[in-house]
Amino acid sequence: GGYEEDYLKIPKDVLTTTMISHQKYFPVVNEAGKLLPYFIAVSNTKPRDISVVAKGNERVLRARLADASFFFEEDKKVPLEDRVESLKKVVFHTLLGTSHKKVSRFRKLAVKIASKVKPSVKKNVDRAALLAKADLESLMVGEFSELQGIMGREYALIAGEKPEIANAIYEHYLPIVAGGDLPQSDEGAIVGLADKMDTIAGFFGVGMPPTGTADPYALRRQALGIINIILSRE
C-alpha cells in the first residue's frame, strides 16, 4: 500500500514507529535508505481481492499518520523550553517527586560531573539536562511514548538549539536495552550518567531496591548502562 508524500515531512522515526510498532507494517526505503511513501502489510489469509485489503490498510495508516502530523504541527507551536515548567505536573514517583524535581537534581549532578571530566562542555551539558525531559509533555510523546528523547532532539533543533544539545537530549536515554547503543557525545554521556545515577540513588534511598524476582524500575539495566558508558569513554 501507499500514503501521501506530504507525510514524509514528519520525522522519519515517527513514520517508522507508526508503521512498525503500531500497525505491524514494513516501511519501504530506497537504495540510499530514504523512506518512500509505501508500506508492506502481511496477511495470514488469502484474500479474494488484494486491492480491497490494501485500501483498508491504507485507510487505517492514513488515520494514524494524520494524527501524528497534527501532533507534530501542534507541538512545534510550543518551544521545548516552555514545556519544562509543565513537568511540575508530571509525577516521576510519589516518593521521589515530579519529573521537574528529578530534572533539577540530575542537572546539578551533570554540571558537577562535566566540571570534573570535561569543563569545555559544561554549558551544553547544563542546557541539555534542563531540556532532557521536556518532550514528555508533548502531544507526540503522549501518544508514542517510545519516541521520548527522539522528539526532544527534533523539537530542540526546531527551536534553534545547538546540534550538540539536541543530540544529548536523545543520547541521554541510551542504552535503551542491555547491550544497546551508547552515547557517542560527551554531553550525552554525562547527562545520561547523571540521570541514571539519580534514578538509582533515589529508589535505593526510599527503600525500593531491586529484588531477586523483581526490578520494576529497571535499576539493574540503569546500573549496567552507567558501567558501559564509563567503560566506553577514553
Model-derived segments and spans:
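Amphipathic alpha-helical "coupling" segments that flank catalytic cores
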Residues: G1-E234
